[in-house]
């Protein structure tokens, strides 16, 4: 199973937001390169790098992310990537995959030529998928979205429980149990995931998971 360490960036710093709210921010490090190197040394080989400034439309962290992409490990980049040019820019800079939400709902056809490099992020609250920084309602239930994008040929998804994100309450078992087995091998679970839940998620048949706050409390809790 693929376990990703989340590295969320805001103003060039490594942070975590609770439930995606900018006012609920914890800064863990002012040096993202130190963080990715430390996590790699601790045994994490996959990284989920999120540009929160770009996601919120208040700036971007492209320069530091491009430096992080030169480090060891498998890296996927997310956050505010809403046009094909930016996708290509990240891939050209060394990203193994690019994670999208808004563009997948607004213009999915534009992504088909690059679908092997695309992971679609499905952010869920009250059974409905949201996009554009969790501000817009897609009108689709989770399994409807998984079916729609799978039929188009997309092979990897991140399913995030918005209410669990950054809470350390554990992954959302209701959501996890609701996803048909045929899709689980394509899905990375996210939102509240704890280090001690990795084996359980693997036993449920999921492709992987993304761990954020629990990771930082363990390795960077004295920040």
For the regions a language model picked out, list residue spans one by one:
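Conserved anion-binding
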Residues: 10-23, 95-165
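Glycine-rich phosphate-binding active-site loops on the catalytic face of alpha/beta enzymes
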Residues: 86-110, 158-166, 190-223
């Amino acid at each position: 199973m693929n376990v990703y360490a989340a590295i969320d960036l805001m103003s060039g710093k490594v942070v975590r937001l609770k439930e995606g709210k900018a006012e609920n921010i914890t800064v863990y490090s002012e040096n993202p390169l130190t963080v990715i190197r430390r996590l790699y040394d601790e045994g994490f080989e996959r990284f989920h790098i999120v540009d929160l400034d770009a996601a919120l439309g208040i700036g971007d962290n492209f320069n530091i992310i491009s430096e992080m992409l030169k480090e060891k490990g498998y890296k996927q980049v997310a956050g505010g990537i809403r046009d094909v040019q930016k996708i290509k820019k990240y891939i050209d800079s060394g990203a193994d995959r690019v994670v999208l939400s808004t563009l997948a709902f607004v213009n999915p056809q534009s992504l088909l030529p690059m679908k092997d490099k695309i992971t679609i992020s499905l952010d869920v609250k009250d059974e409905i998928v949201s996009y554009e920084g969790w501000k817009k309602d897609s009108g689709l239930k989770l399994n409807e979205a998984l079916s729609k994008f799978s039929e188009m040929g997309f092979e990897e998804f991140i399913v995030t429980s918005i209410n669990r994100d950054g809470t350390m309450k554990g992954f959302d078992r209701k959501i996890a149990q609701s996803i048909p087995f045929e899709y689980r091998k394509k899905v990375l679970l996210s939102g509240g995931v704890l280090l001690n839940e990795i084996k359980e998620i693997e036993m449920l048949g999921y492709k992987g998971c993304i761990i954020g706050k629990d990771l930082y409390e363990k390795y960077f809790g004295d920040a």
